Amino acid sequence: MEIIPVIDLMGGRVVHAKEGLRDYYEPIKSVLTSAIDLSSVVTDLKSFFPFNTVYIADLDAISGQELAVGQYQRLVADFPEISFWLDAGIKEEKDLVVLSNIGGIRPVLASETLHDMTLLPGGEETILSLDFRHGQLLGDSRLWEDENLWPDQVILMHLDYVGNRQGPDMGLLKKVMDRNKEVNVVMAGGVRGDRDLELLNDAGVGKVLVATALHEGGLSRTILEIVTKKHCPMIKGSAINVSKLS
């Protein structure tokens, strides 16, 4: 299982996302970093654990502001070992082209903003995010109704669960897995600690987006080492006591 840290960026600062209520987001408070600028937060995340992938939600770009291309060019130059998944509010092909031209960036096509369905299912690098609020898909209903539009990798992002420490939406995950067992689901929202990772691992999830559990200390370095080992199953029977691990 791969754990992918999430960075929510708004007004040039890293913020704490909760339930998708962006008007109320505040600068992040974290046990891993005292910084709120993008580059420093990535540096501190890498110091904590050798993450291969980092997911960034550029909330300014998602809201329609111009993408700060230079910022991401510098980021990939500073961290060439990291694959950055970036949700920058792609609506149509020209938006996708801008991101695709930044080496080291994998664009995320999010249902909340995507207008051009011809971009899907795309190639093997395509990532679709199915965004939900109150159990309803945000965006074009065809993205839920027609699974032929789904690329190999699909993020399930239930905003009600983001930053809420209530566990992942296993019901939504089951609906997707029942419809298409071949899709590689990336689960997002609600993960509290190792018990939730064990549930997702058992359900066949290979990648998980996490923010709150990392920044509040719910996932230790030892836990991350266990769950990210290739072919290493999660411990059965009882969850690992995170509080006793450093």
Please give the residue ranges for each predicted region.
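Hydrophobic faces of well-ordered beta-strands that scaffold small-molecule active sites
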Residues: 2-9, 54-56, 84-88, 107-109, ...
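Conserved anion-binding
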Residues: 7-29, 94-164
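Short catalytic helix/loop segments, enriched in acidic residues and glycine
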Residues: 21-43
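N-terminal active-site wall of soluble small-molecule enzyme domains
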Residues: 47-102, 170
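Charged helix-capping and loop-helix junction motifs
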Residues: 67-74, 139-145, 166-175
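Catalytic cores of alpha/beta
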Residues: 84-103, 171-181, 185-207
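Glycine-rich phosphate-binding active-site loops on the catalytic face of alpha/beta enzymes
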Residues: 102-119, 158-163, 190-193, 203-223
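C-terminal helical cap(s) of enzyme catalytic domains, especially alpha/beta-barrels
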Residues: 118-122, 126-128, 201-202, 207-237, ...
